[in-house]
C-alpha cells in the first residue's frame, strides 16, 4: 500500500533499516541521534526484532558485531563523541568482515561541543577514524526520503561487501521533517548475505572463491568451528604471523572496495552540464545550495552543484568529469574544509577552487553562499 508519511529524518532511517531487514539495534542515547534509538525500541519488537540499550558506545558497537556475526542484520546510532568511542570496534568489524551499519548524526564539536547544532566535522573521521589501512563506505543523505532509501542501500552494501558502512547524517537532516512516500508492496532490492555452499570450504570461513573478492558467510550453529578475530588471519580465521598471508588479507580488504567503486558510489549533479561555477556540497548543506543555484540561474548565471551521495569512497571520476568544463568550484561545508582536501587533490589542476565553511553551529544560508560567490569572482 502506497502512503505518504510526515516523518523525521532519524525516524526514516529506522523505517528504511527495517525494510532492509534490520532486526537488531544496540545503542546509547546521544543528541542528535536519540530518536533513532527511540524509534528502534518501538518498531523492532513489532517486526520480531530486538532492541537493547547498552551501557556505553563501546558496548553498542560490540553488540551489533556479535549479532551480525550470527546472521542478524544489525545497526547502531550515535553522534561525534560516541563515534569516537566506537572506532576500535569499527576496525574490528573491518578486519573480521562483519557487515553492520553505524549511523552518525553529526553535531558541532570538538568534544561535547554543541549537541543540538549542525556540523559535518566527522567526515574525515569516517574515513580515517580507526587505525590502520581499512575499507570504508560512508553515505550522506540530504533529505528525509533519502534517509529512508539510503538506509536500505547502507545495509545492501554492508552485506554485499562484508564491511561496516557509516551512514553519515548531520543534525539538519536528522531533525528535518518531510513527507516520505512509502509503498510496502513495491519491490525494493534487498541484498542478503551469501552463504557457503561448498562443503570442502566449510572449515575455511575466510576462503574466497575464484573470481570473487568477498568470502561467503560460514553457517553458524553447526559442528564446524568458526573463529573470528581482529588479528591478521588466514582462511581458517585463526591468527597468523605469516607476513605474506597478512599482506594478502590487507590487500583484499582494500581491493574489495576499490575494485567496485563504480558499484558503490553515487552522486547528484544539478544543472552542471553548462555550469561555469560548480558548488560541491553534501548532506544538509545541499538544501541552501539548491536555493542558490535556482536563484542565480534565474538571473542568467551558469551555475550548478555536484553532490557526492557516497562520500567514501569519494566519486573521483564523476568530479573530474564535471570539473573538466567548469571555471570555478566552490566547496561548501559545515566544517573547516574536509571534503575540500579531496576536491583539491582530484581537480586542483583543472579549475580554480574556493571554499566556504561554517563551524559556529548555524546553518550556512543561501545569502552567505551568494556573498561568497560574488567575492571570488
Descriptions of predicted regions:
Residues 128-132, 271-272:
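Short, flexible turn/loop "capping" segments at secondary-structure junctions
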Residues 132-135, 234-235:
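Flexible glycine/proline-enriched surface loops and loop-helix/loop-strand junctions
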Residues 1-128, 135, 152, 171, ...:
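Thiamine diphosphate
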Residues 75-77, 101-103, 138-140, 166-168, ...:
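Structural motif
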Residues 147-151:
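Short amphipathic alpha-helices within nucleic acid-binding modules
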Amino acid at each position: 500500500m502506497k502512503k505518504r508519511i510526515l516523518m523525521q529524518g532519524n525516524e526514516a532511517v529506522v523505517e528504511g533499516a527495517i525494510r532492509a531487514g534490520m532486526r537488531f539495534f544496540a545503542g546509547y542515547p546521544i543528541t542528535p541521534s536519540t530518536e533513532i534509538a527511540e524509534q528502534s525500541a518501538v518498531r523492532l519488537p513489532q517486526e520480531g526484532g530486538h532492541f537493547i540499550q547498552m551501557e556505553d558506545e563501546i558496548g553498542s558497537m560490540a553488540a551489533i558485531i556479535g549479532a551480525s556475526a550470527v546472521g542478524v542484520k544489525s545497526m547502531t546510532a550515535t553522534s561525534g563523541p560516541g563515534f569516537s568511542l566506537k572506532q576500535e570496534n569499527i576496525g574490528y568489524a573491518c578486519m573480521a568482515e562483519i557487515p553492520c551499519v553505524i549511523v552518525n548524526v553529526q553535531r558541532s564539536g570538538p568534544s561535547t561541543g554543541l549537541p543540538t547544532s549542525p556540523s559535518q566535522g566527522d567526515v574525515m573521521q569516517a574515513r580515517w577514524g580507526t587505525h590502520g589501512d581499512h575499507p570504508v563506505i560512508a553515505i550522506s543523505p540530504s533529505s528525509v526520503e533519502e534517509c529512508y532509501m539510503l538506509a536500505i542501500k547502507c545495509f545492501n552494501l554492508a552485506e554485499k561487501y562484508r564491511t561496516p558502512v557509516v551512514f553519515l547524517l548531520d543534525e539538519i537532516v536528522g531533525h528535518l521533517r518531510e513527507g516520505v512516500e512509502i509503498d510496502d508492496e513495491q519491490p525494493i532490492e534487498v541484498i542478503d548475505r551469501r552463504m557457503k555452499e561448498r562443503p570442502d570450504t566449510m572449515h575455511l570461513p575466510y576462503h574466497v572463491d575464484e573470481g570473487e573478492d568477498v568470502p561467503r558467510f560460514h553457517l553458524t550453529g553447526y559442528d564446524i568451528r568458526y573463529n573470528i578475530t581482529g588479528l591478521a588471519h588466514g582462511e581458517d580465521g585463526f591468527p597468523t604471523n605469516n607476513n605474506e598471508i597478512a599482506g594478502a588479507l590487507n590487500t583484499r580488504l582494500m581491493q574489495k572496495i576499490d575494485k567496485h567503486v563504480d558499484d558503490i558510489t553515487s552522486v547528484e549533479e544539478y544543472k552542471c552540464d553548462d555550469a561555469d561555477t560548480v558548488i560541491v556540497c553534501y548532506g544538509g548543506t545541499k538544501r541552501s545550495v539548491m536555493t542558490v543555484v535556482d536563484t542565480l540561474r534565474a538571473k542568467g548565471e551558469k551555475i550548478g552543484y555536484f553532490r557526492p551521495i557516497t562520500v567514501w569512497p569519494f566519486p573521483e571520476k564523476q568530479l573530474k568529469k564535471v570539473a573538466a568544463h567548469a571555471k570555478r568550484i566552490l566547496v561548501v561545508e559545515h566544517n573547516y574544509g574536509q571534503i575540500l582536501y579531496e576536491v583539491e587533490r582530484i581537480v586542483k589542476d583543472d579549475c580554480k577552487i574556493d571554499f566556504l565553511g561554517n563551524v559556529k553551529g548555524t546553518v550556512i544560508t543561501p545569502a552567505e553562499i551568494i556573498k561568497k560567490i560574488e567575492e571570488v569572482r
